Amino acid sequence: MVVLGVDPGSLHTGYGVIRYDNAGFHLLGCGVIRLHRRKSYFERIGEIYRELDSVIGGYAPVRLALETVFLNKNVQSALKLGQVRGAVIALAMNHRLELSEYAPREVKAAVTGRGAASKEQVAFMVTRMLKITGNPATHDVTDALAIALCDLLKTGMGSAAVPQSVVSSGSAGKKNWAQFVQSNPGMVVR
């Protein structure tokens, strides 16, 4: 199962492609589509569409997952983000991909066990789950990878690859999360 995760933005759109099989999660590719402010907004949407179209052509995902709109006080920003998401959704439909969307807290909870996790905690868990050495380029990339991982976990495709302590819920999950943090003090961002 190959999933493309997309973290849409009008200036930076992150993407990550993950395959899950019996051996676990495999990072196939990731990156950031960086757009110039000098280009018109319509040109930027077109560039996002073309770049992601190329990613889909190269990796042949069967699913596309993206984050739901984060409500912002700036109405113009929210509208622009909605238009970018619309282009990504149209692209997914043109390629006949299965499409899912997840709230930011849902993505964080799926990957870290905590819906209020910081971007640094999400990035750390993504690098651990995908066995990435070094530092991924940006939070746009790790957020997109987290969205793809969330999709695999939520659809049941990748749940066998994650330690139970990360995905458990209720008081047992809190205890396991506390144990995890205690065992890994270098991961805690204060």
Curated annotation (Swiss-Prot):
<dbReference type="InterPro" id="IPR012337">
    <property type="entry name" value="RNaseH-like_sf"/>
</dbReference>
<dbReference type="GO" id="GO:0005737">
    <property type="term" value="C:cytoplasm"/>
</dbReference>
<keyword id="KW-0378">Hydrolase</keyword>
<keyword id="KW-0963">Cytoplasm</keyword>
<feature type="binding site">
    <location>
        <position position="7"/>
    </location>
    <ligand>
        <name>Mg(2+) 1</name>
    </ligand>
</feature>
<feature type="active site">
    <location>
        <position position="140"/>
    </location>
</feature>
<dbReference type="GO" id="GO:0006310">
    <property type="term" value="P:DNA recombination"/>
</dbReference>
<keyword id="KW-0479">Metal-binding</keyword>
<comment type="function">
    <text>The RuvA-RuvB-RuvC complex processes Holliday junction (HJ) DNA during genetic recombination and DNA repair. Endonuclease that resolves HJ intermediates. Cleaves cruciform DNA by making single-stranded nicks across the HJ at symmetrical positions within the homologous arms, yielding a 5'-phosphate and a 3'-hydroxyl group; requires a central core of homology in the junction. The consensus cleavage sequence is 5'-(A/T)TT(C/G)-3'. Cleavage occurs on the 3'-side of the TT dinucleotide at the point of strand exchange.</text>
</comment>
<feature type="active site">
    <location>
        <position position="7"/>
    </location>
</feature>
<keyword id="KW-0234">DNA repair</keyword>
<feature type="binding site">
    <location>
        <position position="140"/>
    </location>
    <ligand>
        <name>Mg(2+) 1</name>
    </ligand>
</feature>
<keyword id="KW-0233">DNA recombination</keyword>
<dbReference type="GO" id="GO:0006281">
    <property type="term" value="P:DNA repair"/>
</dbReference>
<dbReference type="Pfam" id="PF02075">
    <property type="entry name" value="RuvC"/>
</dbReference>
<keyword id="KW-0460">Magnesium</keyword>
<feature type="binding site">
    <location>
        <position position="67"/>
    </location>
    <ligand>
        <name>Mg(2+) 2</name>
    </ligand>
</feature>
<protein>
    <recommendedName>
        <fullName>Crossover junction endodeoxyribonuclease RuvC</fullName>
        <ecNumber>3.1.21.10</ecNumber>
    </recommendedName>
</protein>
<dbReference type="InterPro" id="IPR036397">
    <property type="entry name" value="RNaseH_sf"/>
</dbReference>
<dbReference type="GO" id="GO:0008821">
    <property type="term" value="F:crossover junction DNA endonuclease activity"/>
</dbReference>
<keyword id="KW-0238">DNA-binding</keyword>
<keyword id="KW-0227">DNA damage</keyword>
<keyword id="KW-0540">Nuclease</keyword>
<feature type="active site">
    <location>
        <position position="67"/>
    </location>
</feature>
<keyword id="KW-0255">Endonuclease</keyword>
<comment type="subunit">
    <text>Homodimer which binds Holliday junction (HJ) DNA. The HJ becomes 2-fold symmetrical on binding to RuvC with unstacked arms; it has a different conformation from HJ DNA in complex with RuvA. In the full resolvosome a probable DNA-RuvA(4)-RuvB(12)-RuvC(2) complex forms which resolves the HJ.</text>
</comment>
<dbReference type="GO" id="GO:0003677">
    <property type="term" value="F:DNA binding"/>
</dbReference>
<dbReference type="GO" id="GO:0048476">
    <property type="term" value="C:Holliday junction resolvase complex"/>
</dbReference>
<comment type="similarity">
    <text>Belongs to the RuvC family.</text>
</comment>
<dbReference type="InterPro" id="IPR020563">
    <property type="entry name" value="X-over_junc_endoDNase_Mg_BS"/>
</dbReference>
<dbReference type="InterPro" id="IPR002176">
    <property type="entry name" value="X-over_junc_endoDNase_RuvC"/>
</dbReference>
<dbReference type="GO" id="GO:0000287">
    <property type="term" value="F:magnesium ion binding"/>
</dbReference>
